Amino acid sequence: MAIFERRRFLQLTGFAAASAASLLLPRSVWSQTDTSRKFQSNPFALGVASGSPTHESVVLWTRLVESSLDSRAVVVRWEVADDDAFSRIVQSGQHLATADLGHSVHVELQNLQSDRWYFYRFMVGDAVSSIGRTRTFPKAGAVVEKLKISYASCQRWETGYFTAYKHMQAEKPDAVLFLGDYIYEYPGNPVSALRLPSSTSSFGFVLTLDDYRNRYAQYKSDTDLQAMHAACPWLMTWDDHEVQNDYAGLTAGDSGFADVFSKHEDFTLRRAAAYQAYYENMPIRATALTKSLAGLVSGAEMRIYQRVDVGQLASFYMLDPRQYRDRQACSKDGKLGASMVNPAKCTDWLDPKRTMLGAQQESWLSHELASAKQRGSVWNVMAQSTLFGLRDNIAGNGQSFFNDGWDGYAPARKRLTDALQKHAVYNPVMLGGDLHENWVGYLKADYSQNAAAKAAPAIGVEFCGTSITSTAGSSAVEKTPERLAENPHFVFADAKFRGYGVVEFSSKQLTTTLRTVDNVRAKTTTVETLAQFVVTAGRTVIERV
């Protein structure tokens, strides 16, 4: 029997109607709401979240999980208030949670006041969710004195506890930028795992829609992660492990375990299941599903890239470097996925047609950057899933680059830096993840390793963050000093510690603080500052403080 049942996906053609249920359902449906229904366990066990904030709108999220839930739809009530006692309710309503969407709830609030904090909660039967806190951003053109964001990535369940989020919550950020690898699709190793993932798949892999739903439910059971979601809105992008290690567009990657994934007969269906589960479990807008759920089955996009403005202080460009990319160039022995590659031996390395973002997203980003000066944003932050700057992994003679990152898509990287220069974008900042290491450095117009390119002034700064729990490996820790010396456009690197980053913006400067926990394998941790950097607006200089 095939791992994926195509008929199951083709039944999900009514997504558009389901997503707008709160507006279109007849009064007779709302009259069936059973406020006296008793639940044996908490249907809100996965917590609450909010995301995609604008100056007047934000998405509220929850997903019901309870043993008595079946294929029937459930009417969920929601409230938004000015205070956590809900004595001043500003909006309320009902939403239909359908089984076809995993009983997820996405409420897209509108007509909120700008630059305000709100409280929200959900109710079904006798159950009431935990209280979430969210906010809107200032209006376009508004003068904003300060903004604090945290960024994080790469949280593998079995390699540690998500205690970094407990410390992040204490930072009281205005928003969290999550930069990929929210879940991992691998089976757990009972020998080395700290805590094992569950899976309904006979292989122990995440392969089906139910598998993905269960994996998200497991990760979201972490109380520190839940609390951070409830504390402020999140802006999201993904990397590969939300689907499969090293996948590229509609090309399967490398499972690392007997090639179970790469031998699957229809990767498009597997990606569709992963994308649907991502939507079901994240506070993102319904417009991300550009051609409904049915479109995913035939390879349609799930558009998660977007621009979010915070008055005149900052514009955030949330990018998607995974969904539209070409296959990795010159992977060894014809293998799927990533390899370390010597570009001198790879004829495709500098092919100008190769893309990381895809033609449409590249065009969109260029257009957005072209209007950045007119918007007047002091800081222009591109948030994506991996290291942007060139990193040669061999000291001295010879070259070795990772073909799954931007190094493997050098012409696409050059097009982006050309756009930054062409449009004279103010204060470009690149944020990334993926490596499970901290790297801090300069954006270069040209990463060619000749003397002129190396001597040319920088055009922006980059902060690539470490992981929440995922390990970097002992060899990465050992080789970091020589890799840093080999790539002088970077000023700091560390592969030893897990944690997150905090960026504080003002009109005069940004301050980035790298925060690390002492031991992800302990349920109680301490947090320390690994390093702190200041960049003055208008000066592309990174100062360590």
Regions found by a protein language model. Give the residues of each.
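Metal-dependent phosphoester/phosphodiester hydrolase catalytic core
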Residues: 2-545
